[in-house]
Amino acid sequence: MTSEQFEYHLTGKEILEKEFKTGLRGYSPEDVDEFLDMVIKDYSTFTQEIEALQAENIRLVQELDNAPLRTSTQPAPTFQAAAQPAGTTNFDILKRLSNLEKHVFGNKLDDNE
């Protein structure tokens, strides 16, 4: 998306130079100026953010265009399971679990059987 796709009605400079008509009970010029100062700051911030996002978008599109295509013939990266420490087998794990249950539950396990 480029800025040509959006229509901007005002620039920060146009907001700054805007003159307001005042009547007998018109707006306070100080209040209007203070508010417009905030609008100008926000407008400038939005413009900077849009430019930064457009630059990032261009960079990412170029990065994507330059990235090699992954085809079905290329295997997806796989994660290998962590190697078990020496001596740790399913039997050892079950034995540890049994000992832990006996320690935690004590005679309660024997009473339920």
UniProtKB/Swiss-Prot annotation:
Compartments, record wording: Cytoplasm
Domain of life assignment: Bacteria
Keywords noted in UniProt: Cell cycle, Cell division, Cell shape, Coiled coil, Cytoplasm
Gene that produces this protein: gpsB
Listed InterPro entries: Cell_cycle_GpsB, DivIVA_domain, DivIVA_fam
Consequence of gene disruption: Cells lacking this gene have increased lysozyme resistance, which is important for escape from the host innate immune response. The lysozyme resistance is OatA-independent, but is dependent on PgdA, and an increased N-deacetylation of the peptidoglycan is observed in these cells. The phenotype is suppressed by the concomitant deletion of gpsB and pbpA1.
Protein name as it appears in the record: Cell cycle protein GpsB
Chief location of this protein within or outside the cell: cytoplasm
Similarity comment text for this entry: Belongs to the GpsB family.
Entries under Pfam families matching the protein: DivIVA (PF05103)
Cellular component aspect of the GO annotation: cytoplasm
Organism: Listeria monocytogenes serovar 1/2a (strain ATCC BAA-679 / EGD-e)
